[in-house]
């Protein structure tokens, strides 16, 4: 029997919704990245985008372990000499909690030609509502929550 090689149109894509309330950010990012890549499917291949769509709600209620809100820094650079700026994760969570969660999930994805295509299937919302009810997303439960 020859080895099965999946093609781009062979897989059916589902929609999953993840509630980020009291879930540690790293564990949430791993679960979402695995769903986006399709690693839970028996037809997984690293060179084919066979993953599912992921909706993350309540990004403003995600948990951080330790003192990461006060001590972990996020950097950005303007491109000019001396243009390095840094903010704590706590400051970023007050303004844009959806971006913090999305950056953590994107950081868990591979950096290759498929990465942009995989990132387009991710939707992150700060509140409990999302505009994707027509897709009938399946609730995805993450077992471990913050203590």
Swiss-Prot record:
Cellular component GO terms, alphabetically?
Answer: cytosolic large ribosomal subunit
The UniProt keyword set, sorted, is: Ribonucleoprotein, Ribosomal protein
Classification via InterPro entries: Ribosomal_uL13, Ribosomal_uL13_bac-type, Ribosomal_uL13_CS, Ribosomal_uL13_sf
Example GO BP = negative regulation of translation
Recorded GO MF terms: mRNA binding; structural constituent of ribosome
A Pfam family of this chain: Ribosomal_L13
Record carries keyword DNA repair = no
Q: How does it assemble?
A: Part of the 50S ribosomal subunit.
Q: Which family does it belong to?
A: Belongs to the universal ribosomal protein uL13 family.
Per the entry, what this protein does is: This protein is one of the early assembly proteins of the 50S ribosomal subunit, although it is not seen to bind rRNA by itself. It is important during the early stages of 50S assembly.
Q: Which NCBIfam families match?
A: rplM_bact
Quote the protein name from its UniProt record. Answer: Large ribosomal subunit protein uL13
Write down the species.
Answer: Mycolicibacterium paratuberculosis (strain ATCC BAA-968 / K-10) (Mycobacterium paratuberculosis)
Gene for this chain: rplM
